[in-house]
C-alpha cells in the first residue's frame, strides 16, 4: 500500500470508531486478528492482554462501546510503514493512545496493539 492509502485506511479506522458502528469497526480487521491491549487485562483477566480472532475482538469492542457511549477519537498523527500504520489519538477522556496495525494483502489488520498514556477504558 502507498503512504496515501495507509493514511486513508487510518482515517477510515478513526471514522469507524467515531461512528460507534461495531460492524464498520470490525471491517478493518481480518478474521485471524491478534490484538494486544491493556483493556483485555482489565475486562477479561488476560494477563498477556491478547485477543485472538474476530469473535473475541467483537465481544471486546462491543463491551467498550457499552462502557463508553461518548467514545470519540481525535486524530493527532499517523505514522506509516511498509505493511501498516500507527495512529496517535486523544480520547474523549483526554487520554492519549497509540494503536499499531499490521495489514495483510487485503488491507485488513492481522496484528494490532493499543498503548495508552493515561486512563484506559
Which residues are covered by each model-predicted region?
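Hydrophobic pocket/interface hotspot
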Residues: 13, 25, 33, 53, ...
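A beta-strand edge to alpha-helix "cap/lid" segment located at domain peripheries
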Residues: 2, 58, 65-121
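A solvent-exposed, acidic/Ser-Thr-rich amphipathic alpha-helical stretch
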Residues: 3, 24, 30-81
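Short, low-complexity N-terminal intrinsically disordered segments enriched in polar/charged residues
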Residues: 1-27, 31, 120-121
Amino acid at each position: 500500500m502507498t503512504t496515501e492509502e495507509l493514511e486513508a485506511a487510518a482515517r477510515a479506522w478513526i471514522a469507524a470508531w467515531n461512528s460507534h458502528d461495531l460492524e464498520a469497526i470490525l471491517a478493518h480487521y481480518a478474521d485471524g486478528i491478534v490484538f494486544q491491549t491493556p483493556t483485555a487485562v482489565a475486562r477479561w483477566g488476560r494477563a498477556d492482554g491478547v485477543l485472538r480472532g474476530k469473535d473475541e475482538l467483537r465481544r471486546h469492542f462491543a463491551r467498550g462501546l457499552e462502557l463508553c457511549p461518548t467514545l470519540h477519537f481525535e486524530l493527532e498523527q499517523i505514522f506509516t510503514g511498509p505493511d501498516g500504520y500507527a495512529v496517535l489519538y486523544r480520547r474523549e477522556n483526554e487520554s492519549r493512545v497509540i494503536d499499531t496495525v499490521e495489514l495483510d494483502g487485503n488491507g485488513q489488520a492481522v496484528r494490532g496493539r493499543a498503548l495508552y498514556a493515561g486512563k484506559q477504558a
